Amino acid sequence: MPRSFLVKKVKLDAFSSADLESAYGRARSDLGAPLHDKGYLSDYVGPSSVYDGDAEAALLKGPSPEPMYAAAVRGELGPAAAGSAPPPTPRPELATAAGGYINGDAAVSEGYAADAFFITDGRSRRKASNAGAAAAPSTASAAAPDGDAGGGGGAGGRSLGSGPGGRGGTRAGAGTEARAGPGAAGAGGRHACGECGKTYATSSNLSRHKQTHRSLDSQLARRCPTCGKVYVSMPAMAMHLLTHDLRHKCGVCGKAFSRPWLLQGHMRSHTGEKPFGCAHCGKAFADRSNLRAHMQTHSAFKHFQCKRCKKSFALKSYLNKHYESACFKGGAGGPAAPAPPQLSPVQA
C-alpha cells in the first residue's frame, strides 16, 4: 500500500472547542454533580428527575447503565477472569508518542493474500449447489437397505420393483436402452458417430456432423439459388450464402468481401502491416491463417512427399511448387518425370 494512504497522526482525546467546553462547564456546575478524576460525570443522572426540577433527586447514587457485555458472558470465563484487568493493547508501540497521537511511522501495513479479496460469482455458487444436489440422491440411494427394493411397503419398494407391476424398473430399463444408442455418450463422455466413429463433446456437434453423411440425392440436401451448388450441411450452406452478399467494399481498390474481417485483412495489403509473426523464425504475415499454415513448416510431421526424390513437405502448396522445380523438369541430368496427377477437390 502506498505511504500516502497511511494516516501519520490522528488526535485521540484532545478535541477542543471553546463553545462546547463552556456549555459543558455550565451544565456541570448547574447540576452540581461530582466529577471523576478524568473530568467526566461519575454518577448516572436520571433524566426524569432533572426534567421535574428536583435538584436533590437529580443525583442518583445508583449503579451506572448496563455495560455493553452481559455479566453472564463474563461469568462463563470463570471467577478468576471476572475480576482481572483488561488485556493490554495488541499494538502498544503505536500509542507511545506524547500528546495522545498515533505514531504513523511505527505503523506497518498489513499484508493480505489474494484469496481475501476473491469473490466468487454466481456461476461458481450455482455449480457448487448443483453438485451438492446431485450428490444427495446418490448418497441416499447408497444408504438405502436392500430390503426396501424387494417389495416392502415403502415407496422405495414400489419405484424399484422388478416384478410385472414394477413400473419404475421397466421405465428405467427403457431409458437405459434409449441412452445406449449409436450416438450416446461413451465411457469418456464423448458422443460417437455410428458411421465413421468420430467423437464429439456435445450431442449438438454430433448431429451437425451427421449432416455430412447425407447423400447429395437426399431430400434433406439443399441447393444454392444463386449458383446451384448443392449442400447437405445446413451450417455450411448458410456460410456459403454469405459469399454472394458482398456488402463490405474496399475504399482503395473497390474489391468487395462478404465478411468484415476479410476486408480488414485485405486492408493490410494496402498498408503493409504484418502483425502476425512466427515465434520460431520471425517471419511475419498479414493474415493469421497464413501464419498457421507457415507454422506447419516447423512441425516434424510432413505428410506430403515427392514421388521422385522422396522429399517431404508440411504443406501441399510447397509440394506443388516442388513439382514445378528442376526435380520434375529433368534437372541434374536425369530424365524428366511425368507431371504430377491432378487431384479432384474431394481427394484434396
UniProtKB/Swiss-Prot annotation:
Cellular component terms, GO, for this chain's entry? nuclear body
Where are the compositionally biased (Low complexity) regions? 130-147, 173-182
Keyword Repressor assigned to the entry: answer is: yes
Endpoints of the signal sequence: none
An example GO biological process term is: regulation of DNA-templated transcription
Tissue specificity annotation: Brain specific.
* Protein keywords: DNA-binding, Metal-binding, Nucleus, Repeat, Repressor, Transcription, Transcription regulation, Zinc, Zinc-finger
GO molecular function, a single term: DNA-binding transcription factor activity, RNA polymerase II-specific
What Pfam families does this protein map onto? zf-C2H2, zf-C2H2_6
Tell me where in or outside the cell this protein is found.
Answer: Nucleus
Q: State where composition is biased (Gly residues).
A: 148-172
Domain comment from the record reads as follows: The N-terminal non zinc-finger region mediates the repressor activity.
Annotated function: Transcriptional repressor that binds E-box motif CAGGTG. Can modulate the action of basic helix-loop-helix (bHLH) transcription factors, critical for neuronal differentiation.
Write out the similarity annotation. Answer: Belongs to the snail C2H2-type zinc-finger protein family.
What name does UniProt use for this protein?
A: Transcriptional repressor scratch 1
Organism in which the protein naturally occurs: Homo sapiens (Human)
